[in-house]
């Protein structure tokens, strides 16, 4: 978000105060403080920042909510017959209170809700009003509801390309509300009808307060208006778009994530991921009911993120179960950090869905490159059990569905760092998916849908 070059050691205290303030306020983001070596050897006087004067950047926030905007927000809700809440990481960044307020507003309205990858956990994943994740690998019901809605209420999301699909066919008939703390995100990709620059918590508090005062029996009075909408959503749900063909001989990656969820859901579990198919399967099949239990790289999509993230989470929550759901390729990007986990006695669990491929690359090679699997197959993988033992960790391997539960329990009950090598089906692809260059309502639900060729325009958008 900003950077400083320290030229005088006596400026360092003020710069550090500014750096922490700018990094953590508004839309959170990294800052850089460059301290040259000669400055590092100087001594200065530390001054407490009493003025709270912070360097103003583009996108700074007034923190004043316009009541006209709040009233218009509520009026648009009241007029809608096919609404949907579309929520993102901004809800989680706003703090735990924002998630509580979001649940209250969704309950007050009776509207369906979907979430981006980074917003998972802001709303309970097992609630019947939750349609699952939306976007490129989102559910059939979430994506079709986004396409067909007449009111889209975007709270803390940014209309990124993984969500919108073909942007000129994105939700063509809907009115759109966009709430974001960063004004530069509003109107950047999608034109909206009501733009509100605000912290999510503050906006939701204002909306709920006025909504309760003026619409005490909203759900019962509005039920008939949205009945057809919910009927349509239930028809989309009947597609069961996250279903897959299970196997008694081979572990399906979706099954592995489901079993991990079932065996850990009664604990306060923290999940990190690497980047790839395993990341999407985790988002689809592991249900998050609290914020800040899901840490994943969704913007840059950096392979190698999950292991150091798990280390950080374990240090912050030393008595909690922390699992990095990984791919065999991504985990090798930062595998040296296992020594950090060993050195600091951090009992993280690395749960590798090992299909011997960079699976997401392979899936796109099937769609776009006539199955020319260039550089996506890894023949010379290490033995992950022996690799774990070499670091001083515990190695566990599961090859068949029959032994999976027992091995997962062994992993959970081991009070040391664990590398779990879960050998899964090599050919399994991640569905559903929106092909590149297509709108929300043209999804691939399985291999049988892949026959339609991706357009040249779509190929350039991957």
Identify the residue ranges that each predicted region occupies.
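Conserved thiamine diphosphate
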Residues: 1-41, 117-120, 146, 156-178, ...
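Glycine-rich, acidic loop regions that bind phosphate or pyrophosphate groups
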Residues: 1-14, 37, 119-228, 408
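Active-site diphosphate/adenylate-binding microenvironment
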Residues: 231-308, 313
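Thiamine diphosphate
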Residues: 143, 148, 187-189, 195-197, ...
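Glycine-rich beta-alpha junction loops
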Residues: 35-40, 89-91, 183, 275-277, ...
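Glycine-rich phosphate/diphosphate-binding loops that line cofactor/substrate pockets in enzymes
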Residues: 21-27, 69-85, 105, 146-148, ...
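Conformationally flexible catalytic loops at phosphate/diphosphate-handling active centers
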Residues: 18, 22-79, 242, 443-445
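Glycine-rich, anion-gripping cofactor-binding loops and their flanking helix/strand elements
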Residues: 89-177, 288-320, 332-335, 366-367, ...
